[in-house]
Structure formats: structure tokens, C-alpha cells
Amino acid sequence: LLGNTISKYFLEREDYQTIAILRDYAKLKLFHKKFHQKFLVIENILDYAKTEKIIKSIKPDILINCLGITNKEILINPIQVEKIITINSLFPHWLQRICSDLGTRLIHLSTDCIFSGNKGFYSEEDIPDPPDIYGRSKLLGELNYENTLTIRKSVIGHELVNKKGLLEWFLDQTNFVQGYKNVIFSGITVLEL
């Protein structure tokens, strides 16, 4: 959802030299052929030696980390806790170390799910109280180093692969839908982010 949208946005802009990394060759078909040469496919992003070598060969000015296991993925397909912690918690810090060595600025995407929602009207000064493994793993992955920016976000948008997100569900409805009362969604679309 987010990684694909961010990749498309920067690939279509001629004022940026963009290289996007995919974890699956099959996803390459989701992008226009004119952009295919701007993609690298690293099927095992957790092959740290290979991934580090590739990043260091690129020497990016800015790296945007969109890698993560989402809450929805965890609910649909139970994933081992070790894998969730590795990708959502440890990987961002490993990536930060490489970016620090290169002088690369790192933008890391986190989530509003580090808050339970019990209090409401949260600000960045509030103490996180994640209710589940997803929120806890994303909180552990947040970066607070020089040359890093962690963005806590809640987004809605089109999913490019499984088409089972909230927006697709809503657009597929042919009649009235039941909703909620007194609920505030303060997220943005992936295009706005």
C-alpha cells in the first residue's frame, strides 16, 4: 500500500533520481515498464550482508523505509513473533546504522497503533500504550537518531495486490453501509503522505 504508492510518486518525478527496492519479482508488473530499470529486487531483505552491500553501492541521499509487517497481515495470516520483531523492530535500527555510516538521511514510517485508543486525542508527547504485538513491534522500531525522521501515520488508500483494505471494501459496497458514531479518523491518504 504505502511502499508502492511512495515508489510510484518518486519514480514519476524527474527531479529525483529514484531507486526502489522490491522483495518480489511478481510485484514489478504493478509498475509501468518504463520504470522497471529503476527497481532492485532483494527477495530476502533480511540477508543483511547483501542488503548492506546494495545500499552502500547506491549511496542514497535519502532512504525511505516502508518495510513492515502490518497489523492486517498479522490478523489474516498469523506470523511468528520473531519475524514481526525482526522486521518491525530490529530492521529499522540496523538500517539506521548503515545510513549513519553513509551520511544518508533515513525516513522511517511507524504507526498510530502505538497508542491503544483508550485515551483519545493523542499527541506525540503522550506515552505510547500499544495494545498488541503489532503496536509494540512498531514502537520498538521507532528511530530517534540524528539524520532520522520517524513518521507516525494512519493512512488509507488503494492496495495494489490483495485489494482487501478498508478503501476497497468501502468502494465495493453497492448500498448503504453501517458505520460508527463518535469515531474520529485523523489519518490521511497515502497520496497525501
What is the predicted role of each segment?
Residues 42-87:
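NAD(P)H-binding glycine-rich loop region in Rossmannoid oxidoreductase-like domains
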Residues 3-4:
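N-terminal Rossmann-fold NAD(P) dinucleotide-binding loop
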Residues 131-133, 143-192:
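NAD(P)-dependent short-chain dehydrogenase/reductase
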Residues 13-19:
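A generic structural motif
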Residues 101-105:
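A short helix->loop->beta-strand "cap" motif at the edges of active sites that frequently abuts
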Residues 20-29, 44-45, 68:
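N-terminal Rossmann-fold cofactor-binding loop
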